[in-house]
């Protein structure tokens, strides 16, 4: 009822202030804070479908009924992301430490090519700071290809350059469309924010004026008629509030609506900030973040650049991911992560913008060389000009028995038709065997089981995992709900790490197979296909047609004979 009233309230704000608004979409295309009006347990993703009637991963059930008092080994999990708050109360005891490196002595003690890499490495930093924002890959490709083909007619393109020219046409079309779309969204959010910010200020002033005239009492709709007009200011305040509230049913306290309007302003500001970054940095052809790093961006195989600040300027995303995987299950504070015996390695390579292939390749190699058994990769983009370097890193991880788990993305796209990078499909036509692609699911076993934003693909996405309204760690000892395939990915990584910990003789490929074979199926269930209103079989949206489940995975692992240990 309160939200309905706020809707009337906002409508009358527009009427009173006589400003025409654009239609707008308040959905911001990234992993976002969720609507907390849905009353579900904060730890729903750990719960069991049978006992709790929530489509969680049954982690708590696995621990209580299958793993109780069983021994486990510590597993190193690498998180390639925006950075992690390594001092967070629920993570600090689980952060990986490079025991072969002496802190702060300015020497590469372990000779791994990285000086003072105590808790990981930052590939988007330099001697004088860190990259916060960066351009999108489509912007970088647009700038590169524009120099070659902007004024070239297709008929004059040599046979050797036909493929690159076709890429230019694709890149140009996407850049032009996306830049305009983001600029329009920015303008719309900004116009609305300015309108409602002005309205809030005016109405707050009116409320305070009338409140003062009434001896400090709360201003109700019903009390406005009793306000004695003794000056022009009171007259303005009474007329303005009366006009705003005249068609709203029931008696209303103005201060309550002002509080809700303030909350709405926060949402609008989030939109303004997001699209401002996109326009100012993401699609800015003149912006160059690599002056901070000091490397050669065109040298895909350069090593040794970066710094050891594994937290960075904005560790929200990476910290949230880390908590899902392994927040301390034993300290009775905050939340419980999925895996109970992990060390988390922070490898910073993802800015507010698109990650660079060079950094991702180096990040994967760093994780593998320093003992990670599974790597979380909650990022992605539409173009990959340095794919060759990433592919080599993926193959290197495969050769070393390291599992790579990647978020499918949040565009509501079919990845069978719209590729997302990095990918298991290597440039030479070979498919990486150590790869899992993860879509996002929700808490109810109904048409809304799949996250409305999630990418999918019968040939491309392996399975789904909880990614809607996920409560986890955020910087400065805080906790927050976020959603996205970026949350589904660590939910899967957490289960993988759990298996590796309690069944240490299993190989990465065996763990991958167990995760896929043990998914929970939903025979006959039709769900809303992301990005549409069409209902399709849930089984048609991924390879397995199922949700990751820790309990079922542990049961299956107990029945599998491990591969012989290497001598």
Regions found by a protein language model. Name each.
Residues 21-54, 402, 558-567:
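Sec-dependent signal peptide cleavage junction
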Residues 63-71, 312-315, 336-339, 354-376, ...:
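Mature extracellular/periplasmic domains of secretome proteins
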Residues 290, 402, 423-501, 505, ...:
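Extracellular S/T/G-rich loop segment that most often corresponds to the catalytic His/Ser-adjacent loop
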Residues 348, 376-380, 407-408, 439, ...:
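A cross-family glycoside hydrolase active-site/sugar-binding cleft signature
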Residues 368-370, 374-377, 386-388, 433-437, ...:
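C-terminal subdomain of the subtilisin-like protease fold in secreted/lumenal serine endopeptidases
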């Amino acid at each position: 009822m309160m939200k309905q009233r706020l809707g009337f309230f906002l409508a009358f704000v527009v009427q009173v202030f006589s400003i025409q608004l654009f239609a707008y979409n308040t959905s911001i295309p990234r992993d976002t804070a969720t609507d907390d009006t849905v009353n579900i347990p904060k730890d729903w993703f750990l719960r069991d479908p049978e006992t709790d009637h929530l489509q969680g991963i049954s982690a708590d059930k696995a621990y209580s009924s299958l793993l109780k008092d069983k021994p486990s080994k510590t597993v190193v999990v690498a998180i390639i992301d925006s950075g992690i708050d390594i001092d967070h109360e629920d993570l600090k005891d689980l952060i990986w430490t490079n025991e072969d490196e002496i802190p702060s002595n300015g020497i590469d003690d372990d000779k791994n090519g990285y000086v003072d890499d105590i808790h990981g490495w930052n590939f988007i930093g330099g001697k004088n700071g860190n990259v916060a924002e960066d351009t999108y890959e489509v912007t970088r490709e647009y700038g590169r290809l524009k120099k070659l083909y902007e004024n070239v007619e297709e008929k004059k393109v040599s046979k050797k350059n036909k493929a690159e020219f076709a890429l230019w046409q694709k890149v140009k079309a996407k850049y032009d469309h996306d830049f305009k779309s983001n600029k329009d969204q920015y303008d719309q959010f900004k116009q609305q924010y300015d309108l409602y910010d002005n309205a809030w200020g005016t109405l707050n002033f009116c409320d305070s004026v009338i409140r003062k005239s009434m001896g400090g009492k709360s201003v109700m709709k019903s009390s406005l008629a009793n306000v004695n007009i003794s000056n022009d200011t009171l007259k303005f305040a009474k007329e303005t509030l009366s006009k705003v509230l005249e068609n709203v049913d029931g008696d209303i306290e103005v201060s309550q609506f002002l509080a809700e309007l303030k909350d709405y302003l926060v949402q609008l500001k989030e939109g303004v900030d997001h699209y401002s970054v996109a326009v100012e940095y993401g699609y800015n052809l003149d912006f160059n973040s690599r002056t901070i790093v000091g490397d050669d961006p065109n040298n895909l195989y350069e090593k040794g650049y970066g710094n050891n600040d594994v937290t960075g300027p904005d560790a929200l995303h990476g910290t949230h991911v880390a908590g899902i995987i392994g927040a301390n299950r034993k300290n009775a504070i905050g939340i419980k992560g999925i895996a109970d015996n992990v060390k988390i390695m922070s490898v910073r390579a993802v800015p507010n913008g698109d990650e660079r292939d060079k950094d991702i390749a180096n990040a994967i190699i760093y994780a593998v060389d320093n003992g990670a058994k599974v790597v979380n990769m909650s990022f992605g983009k539409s173009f990959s000009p340095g794919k060759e370097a990433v592919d080599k890193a993926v193959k290197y991880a495969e050769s070393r028995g390291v599992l790579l788990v990647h978020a499918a993305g949040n565009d509501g796209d079919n990845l069978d038709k719209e590729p997302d990078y990095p990918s298991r499909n290597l440039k030479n036509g070979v498919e990486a065997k150590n790869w899992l692609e993860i879509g996002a699911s929700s808490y109810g076993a109904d048409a809304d089981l799949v996250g409305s934003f999630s990418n999918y693909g019968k040939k491309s996405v392996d399975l789904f995992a909880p990614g809607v309204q996920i409560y986890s760690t955020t910087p400065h000892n805080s906790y927050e709900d976020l959603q996205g395939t970026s949350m589904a990915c660590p939910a899967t990584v957490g289960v993988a790490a759990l298996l590796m910990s309690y069944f240490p003789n299993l190989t990465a490929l065996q763990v991958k197979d167990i995760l896929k074979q043990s998914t929970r199926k939903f025979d006959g269930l039709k769900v809303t296909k992301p990005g549409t209103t069409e209902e399709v079989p849930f089984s048609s949206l991924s390879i397995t047609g199922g949700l990751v489940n820790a309990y079922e995975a542990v049961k299956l692992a107990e029945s599998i004979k491990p591969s012989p240990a290497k001598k």
